């Protein structure tokens, strides 16, 4: 494991526990390499706080120190702007009696020890999908550009300089697996509300959803170190009062109990008591799990996603065969009708036009996604035969 990976874990632990890092660790840090790693996992702000506690910037090059501090300040500024904008959006929802619920990071960011410590890429809100058209009019009227209104499970809205909202019509879709899709199909039955409009999960149900969402990424393209930090912070803040019997039964029902337990225990070991050599105490399984998190970045990698899909196609646990690679390539070039259900509903409804979609995707890939396709092809080639 690289030294910067050990250092970022230690520094995050120091930031979370308000502990001053050891001078020997600070003196050995490559701030440029650490910055690249922190950015890859959307952890620059919390890592910067750890570095500031150790006075790491006192002797650092001016431009390097400036880069770190700007990253932290921008993360805080974005949350301030997004919070203010979110209040405008939710005030509108309340005025129109549109039921909604803040999701994921919107809840997590407020239980971290310091404001701005958890960086945010976007704000996620579940809403009553019957109000989609009304919300679309409101958001575009505020200067947002939107997409995804007929695909997937959320509508994405963007506005300069930093505004990014995902308004969810559902928490999971068919593409995320039948178990998760079915469990959350009637999510309104699990919601609590004081005014009948602004909703929330119980602490237990939020944790179950948070774990399910993390596992969705973990089991597909992967999820990064920030997920482990979320596990630690949430359990530190809420864990003692949660009904563990209920949690266990629901997590087992979803098939993610082992994932939750292993991630929770690993997170606690990494961050509860900051130690520079904490990784030396990990078991072989814990080390492998941590390496997967570290290798995934915030939102996973193409390599993880491709490898998982080819393993599913192979089906027998043996090394990936040439036949499997060919099947994978064909599935990417010529996706079937079921895949279109969430991604291109028109072609799901009218499959006779599928060839037009195939041609469009191929040309779009060649023009706009060459780098992505090259990475995917490289992963397919590297798979063991």
Residue ranges and their predicted role:
Residues 1-121, 127-385:
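Conserved NTP-donor binding/palm subdomain of two-metal-ion nucleotidyltransferases/polymerases, i.e.
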């Amino acid at each position: 494991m690289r030294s910067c990976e050990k250092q970022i874990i230690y520094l995050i632990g120091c930031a979370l526990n308000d502990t001053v890092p050891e001078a020997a660790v600070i003196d050995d840090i490559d701030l440029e390499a650490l910055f690249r790693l922190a950015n890859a996992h959307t952890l620059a702000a919390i890592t910067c706080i750890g570095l500031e506690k150790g006075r790491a910037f006192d002797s650092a090059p001016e431009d390097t120190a400036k880069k770190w501090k700007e990253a932290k300040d921008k993360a805080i500024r974005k949350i301030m702007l997004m919070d203010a904008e979110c209040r405008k959006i939710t005030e509108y929802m309340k005025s129109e009696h549109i039921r909604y619920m803040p999701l994921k990071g919107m809840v997590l960011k407020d239980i971290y020890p310091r404001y701005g410590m958890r960086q945010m890429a976007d704000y996620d809100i579940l809403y009553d999908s019957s109000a989609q058209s009304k919300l679309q009019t409101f958001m575009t009227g505020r200067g947002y550009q939107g997409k995804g209104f007929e695909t997937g499970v959320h509508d994405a809205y963007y506005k300069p300089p930093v505004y990014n909202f995902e308004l969810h019509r559902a928490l999971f879709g068919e593409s995320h697996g039948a178990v998760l899709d079915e469990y959350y199909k009637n999510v309104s039955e699990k919601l609590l509300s004081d005014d009948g409009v602004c909703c929330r999960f119980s602490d237990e149900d939020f944790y179950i959803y948070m774990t399910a969402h993390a596992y969705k990424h973990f089991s597909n393209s992967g999820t990064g170190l920030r997920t482990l930090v979320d596990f630690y912070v949430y359990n530190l803040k809420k864990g003692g009062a949660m009904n563990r019997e209920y949690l266990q039964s629901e997590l087992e029902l979803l098939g993610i109990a082992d994932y939750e337990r292993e991630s929770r225990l690993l997170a606690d070991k990494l961050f509860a008591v900051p130690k520079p050599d904490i990784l030396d105490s990990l078991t072989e399984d814990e080390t492998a799990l941590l390496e997967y998190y570290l290798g995934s970045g915030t939102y996973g990698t193409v390599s993880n996603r491709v490898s998982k899909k080819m393993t599913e196609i192979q089906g027998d646990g043996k090394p990936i065969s040439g036949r499997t690679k060919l099947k994978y390539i064909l599935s990417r070039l010529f996706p079937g009708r079921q895949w279109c259900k969430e991604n291109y509903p028109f072609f799901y409804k009218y499959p006779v036009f599928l060839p037009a979609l195939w041609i469009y995707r191929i040309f779009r890939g060649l023009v706009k996604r060459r780098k992505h396709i090259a990475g995917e092809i490289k992963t397919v080639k590297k798979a063991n035969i």
